[in-house]
Amino acid sequence: MSSLKNLFSVDAELSKRTKLFISILGWCLLLGIWWLITAYEWINPYILPSPQKVFGSYAVLLSEKELISQIGYSVSINLLGYIQAVVIAIPLGFIIGLIPFFRELIIKQIGAARFTPLPATTAIFMAIFGVGLNLKIQFLAFGIFLYLLPAIVQRIDEIKTDDHLRAVKQTMITLNASPWQMFKHFYAPSVLSRFFPDIINLVAVSWTYIVIAELLNAQGGLGYLIYLATNRHTHIEQVYAIIILIILIGIIQDYLLKALDRKLFKFKYA
């Protein structure tokens, strides 16, 4: 394990084992502080229930609320909406970022669209997509798309100012690379390798939108369970339990996407 001096030194390197130990310690401290606060009721138990009560509520959620199927419902909406947003944002982002006419035509409108208050658009989405599952998927996809599209355009702009990448681009031009070769061997790998972390980071945002989406003609999902628990004002421990579950799902998604990033763009980690 790293020496105590390294633990508090500026920019010091720690071993993987030490990092894991500190990470586990952090979670244990958080759980201990939570237990201490609730044991002495420093905060109203209705506002902050005890860890025992929160984790004990999973039994009720599993037996009475069909928790497993609700998880599947929410994860399916998340994946379908996210994949749709990514599939649309990537080609459109390249068109806007690389072709001057389209950039000047709509880049400012795209930037302004990020300020759209999504909850206020629910009535519009219901009018267009009805009240079924597709409504929730399209609402989520739109919310993510608003952030992904400007992000990929920004990544294209960044490679234009990178000295190393500019040199690579100039070399390809000197070798008379075709536009398709330039895109395939230069723009696509350079931009997507920088853009993938944006995809990962927006997973967290997507779960915020899911809670909103699932309340549109509520039919199920984790957001719907949160609504039921808060609406009755008697099951606040279930709210905490579901929030913890959403965080756990997000951590798993984050881990899987980072593993995919390392597999797709090995040159970043060479």
Segments and roles (model prediction):
Residues 133-202:
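Membrane-cytosol interface at the C-terminal ends of specific transmembrane alpha-helices
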Residues 14-42:
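N-terminal signal-anchor transmembrane alpha helix
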Residues 197, 239-270:
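C-terminal transmembrane helix and the adjacent membrane-cytosol boundary/short C-terminal tail
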Residues 33-63:
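Short membrane-interfacial helix/loop motifs at transmembrane-helix boundaries
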Residues 1-25, 255-270:
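Transmembrane alpha-helical segments of polytopic membrane transport and secretion proteins
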Residues 69-77, 127-149, 238-243:
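Loop-to-helix entry region at the N-terminal start of transmembrane alpha-helices
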Residues 88-127, 151-158, 162:
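Cytoplasmic-entry segments and transmembrane alpha-helices of multi-pass inner-membrane transporters
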Residues 64-95:
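Transmembrane alpha-helix signature in integral membrane proteins
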